[in-house]
Amino acid sequence: MIQHPRIGIRPTIDGRRQGVRESLEVQTMNMAKSVADLISSTLKYPDGEPVECVISPSTIGRVPEAAASHELFKKSNVCATITVTPCWCYGSETMDMSPDIPHAIWGFNGTERPGAVYLAAVLASHAQKGIPAFGIYGRDVQEASDTDIPEDVKEKLLRYARAALATGLMRDTAYLSMGSVSMGIGGSIVNPDFFQEYLGMRNESVDMTEFTRRMDRGIYDPEEFERALKWVKENVKEGFDHNREDLVLSREEKDRQWEFVIKMFMIGRDLMVGNPRLAELGFEEEAVGHHALVAGFQGQRQWTDHFPNGDFMETFLNTQFDWNGIRKPFVFATENDSLNGVSMLFNYLLTNTPQIFADVRTYWSPEAVKRVTGHTLEGRAAAGFLHLINSGSCTLDGTGQATRDGKPIMKPFWELEESEVQAMLENTDFPPANREYFRGGGFSTRFLTKGDMPVTMVRLNLLKGVGPVLQIAEGYTLELPEDVHHTLDNRTDPGWPTTWFAPRLTGKGAFKSVYDVMNNWGANHGAITYGHIGADLITLASMLRIPVNMHNVPEEDIFRPKNWSLFGTEDLESADYRACQLLGPLHK
């Protein structure tokens, strides 16, 4: 069984015996235990289990103890370290020198012992050696006997741990391409060097004929298929057919296509993660899957011109339930856009919640909305908004029908209630696909995302000569008056899922206006997650050495390794680019 990645906690100490070290042992080890307790009681893995920490076998005062800690961590699948100390220690003798995992150091802010002095010294050693480390230093002085972790320190410890765990969860997994390049979209030109060097992932690929092979040869669970078909008939609403009359399929053909798309879902899932049931049926090779943490399906146009499209498959893979009940979502990209798939993956690993995949389709200015609908925008919509709409698929969690404290939310699967599942299904229908675009048919997903949800839109882009760059836009979903929504929505495809999004403006740069956000967006797709997680994304990007070219995160929330400040403190964007370029990818 594959172990969860763990956080290693390193209590470092003044190595002087005969009084000094002995007086600090209990306080130092208690710091380590309190950090481990904070992380394990607050953070969860994507499967809902508490995050595991490993504490060094002893306090670390000299090199042999640092080496013993390193050996333990290697055996324990430690993906990142947090060093803690209340006192002076010997900097380069006690530091962890692993170059391929993130490091953080918390130096206790107290007057009795110089924990802050050690913090500064060891961070200088990290900078000298080219091994980045995050520095954590509480704003307020604490008493030596105080065992509480200050709130500002907690925030940084948890931000670091969330991002560090994401690096560990990605390592040694795969991106699975189902098909190849869709309609010339750059993001679906999969770059294996990026996956290997920045994420520690490998790439796998299957031709889309693998779907028809498995259907024709019965390489799926027939019992599950019958159960799935019954569930779909009882729970999934077929929507209005918007096709012109000569393109409307017969009832018999639509029924056949429902069976087809259910099989597509089962096969897509089995390709990603395997299915032991297939081995029982005699298909041992297919049963193991591809160890894929994220995948994408090309679809257009070679598949969709002939077969039912992938919308149903993509929708339910990204959703946290199906006929087998509530479960964690898969991360699955439309049009095999691997870069949007990775954007979704970053969001998912930081939040444990499902992701909206959408076209960043239209900027609606207040003037244009007024001209088309007669409505004057106000509130969060006053400066205009973006129409986020995918061409037929989206996680049903994106409806916003789950709630917390009476407000719409996208929540982890272990919090999801059966009543919320039913609400998502009731507020979604599945119209026959637009056969002018999808000649082979299929069924799209249609819903409207509820308003007033805090969300973050993210996109990873590849820039020749630079490499990957990340852009982030925090904002809110909107609920427009019903007639306004219908007027605007019907100008695109009324059979597709819509989210109205207003980014938070800052008055400068790419966030001077909503138009500027649209104009500076790097690609046609975006990954949208619940919550304002821009600060976590910036921390994760710095660990992977991916510069951020556009964000609206308050400066006081930005948390990067300490040596980033040595590249400049006034122009943080420029310093980020220089640091990432000099240090290079995490796994190179």
From Swiss-Prot:
An individual GO BP term: L-fucose catabolic process
Pathway: Carbohydrate degradation; L-fucose degradation; L-lactaldehyde and glycerone phosphate from L-fucose: step 1/3
Active site location: E335, D359
Gene3D superfamilies: 3.40.50.1070, L-fucose Isomerase, Chain A, domain 2, L-fucose/L-arabinose isomerase, C-terminal
Keyword list, A-Z: Carbohydrate metabolism, Cytoplasm, Fucose metabolism, Isomerase, Manganese, Metal-binding
Main location: cytoplasm
GO molecular function: arabinose isomerase activity; L-fucose isomerase activity; manganese ion binding
Catalytic activity: L-fucose = L-fuculose
Binding site for Mn(2+): E335, D359, H525
EC number: 5.3.1.25
SUPFAM superfamilies according to UniProt: FucI/AraA C-terminal domain-like (SSF50443), FucI/AraA N-terminal and middle domains (SSF53743)
Chain's role: Converts the aldose L-fucose into the corresponding ketose L-fuculose.
Family, per entry: Belongs to the L-fucose isomerase family.
Protein name per Swiss-Prot or TrEMBL: L-fucose isomerase
Species of the source: Streptococcus pneumoniae serotype 4 (strain ATCC BAA-334 / TIGR4)
